[in-house]
């Protein structure tokens, strides 16, 4: 089954590359316009989706102006069941609204495979209210799953743009008897996000703009201090 899993991952990655490349490029162009104006990319997810919000952060070869939004009661290390339950609670995010730091030049990528829970939907609403451009990273395979938000809207109804991961219902790409296993949401989401960042860097290069890209701290005398100082005012975790 191991080889079958790799084959399935390759099949889905090929599907994403073939069907989403135009949208990835369009979204990358939009993000570049905001980055050159001084905006940053903020990413949010709960549970395993938070892993994807952290994937692009402080990453060698990745963009510096990237900031994950941490709400610990929605993260796995504070309790896996709790994070899942909290994501489904109406108005759970409201007490955190004033802590969010969106600028009208920012982009907010909200990550939710199912895209029907109140917390990611509220995050998109709050980001839009602050003037940020909102992008959902989700699987449209779940589009028929009803919203749990009191408005009845799903994440794709709120977000300005959608990036479709094509993750199948139930996440797993393998089955044995009645059991579905072999999840791909993290693999596909990480690949799509890194492809987006790569396209952003390519566009910045084509425009002759400076490239805010982290060099690896494990390869000789690299120094990212200047870039960290530049963006540290927007991200306290980058400060000494």
UniProtKB/Swiss-Prot annotation:
Q: Name one Pfam family in it.
A: SIS_2
PANTHER family in the record, alphabetically? PHOSPHOHEPTOSE ISOMERASE (PTHR30390:SF7), SEDOHEPTULOSE 7-PHOSPHATE ISOMERASE / DNAA INITIATOR-ASSOCIATING FACTOR FOR REPLICATION INITIATION (PTHR30390)
Q: Identify this protein by name.
A: UPF0309 protein in nagA 3'region
Q: A GO molecular function for this record?
A: carbohydrate derivative binding
The GO annotation for biological process reads:
carbohydrate derivative metabolic process
The source's domain of life comes to Bacteria
Q: Which SUPFAM superfamilies match?
A: SIS domain
Where in the numbering of this chain does the SIS domain appear? 31-206
Q: Which family does it belong to?
A: Belongs to the UPF0309 family.
